[in-house]
Every structure is written in structure tokens, then in C-alpha cells.
Amino acid sequence: VEAAKRGARVTAVDLSATLISIARERLPSHIGQGSIDFRVGDMSSMELGEFDHVVAMDSLIHYDVADGIRVLAGLADRVRGSILFTHAPSTVLLELMHASGKLFPRGDRSPAIQPVSERRLQKMIARERCLQRWHRGRMQRINRGFYISQACELLPG
């Protein structure tokens, strides 16, 4: 919404039709000169076209780490500017929470995440051919109560 308020044409994608519906309902009546095109689908779909920037907030945390890197690589071929994404950092607290979550019956658990250390993530990014022209930009740890993630920026060049 903030990008649209600043004039951007935003494509908002999620696999969940329910979440897209909620996002549409919560959209403010006035978003300035920009626009938001809500779509149910896979953010890695080539049909979405090219982008100036990509923000994958809490999307890749639900992928196996290697699959998440492949998604980033696929996006990188279609992005002219930056890629911002979050991942679940490998911390003692998060590893304990992740392990204890496995004790509950499957229906009572939140969606699976796979914590990964920053070092391992950066090595995997560096080894991915399609990401070799990209370099790490800003990094920011987000820690709010039980929510922990690591925001990462990839920049071309």
C-alpha cells in the first residue's frame, strides 16, 4: 500500500485466495496515483512479467532453503532493481521453538518454516549462477515477541 501511495504500480501475489480477499477488503479507499493488482497465484510465475523491485515478505520462509534460493534466482532474471526478502534466521530461540512445534499434532501447527543461518544463506546465494551478478545490500533483524525474521536486500551489479 505504501509503495502504491507513492505512485508505484504494485502486483500483490499470494497462493491463498483468502489472504488476497482480506487484502482487497483492507485496501484504503485512496492510495494516491499508484495502483495494486491483487492476484491469486505463485510469485515465481513467469506470467507476472518483469518488475522494478520485488518484496517477498515472509514468503520464502515457507520454502525449503534450496527451493527459496531457486525462487530468488528466477525472480532475479526479471527484476531491474532490488529484491527484498525475509527468511527465518537460525537462532537458538527459533530452533527451540521450531523443535517444540514438532511435538504438536500436524493440524495444530503453524505453517512449516526452515531456519537458516545468514552465513549458509549467503553461501547458497553466491553459488547460484543466476544470482552471481547480485550483491548483498542492507540487512535488518526483526524481533517482535514471538516473531523473528531477517530482512535481506539484494542489489544488482
Question: For each predicted feature, which ranges?
Answer:
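A conserved beta-strand element that flanks and buttresses the S-adenosyl-L-methionine
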Residues: 55-56
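Core SAM-dependent methyltransferase catalytic element
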Residues: 137-157
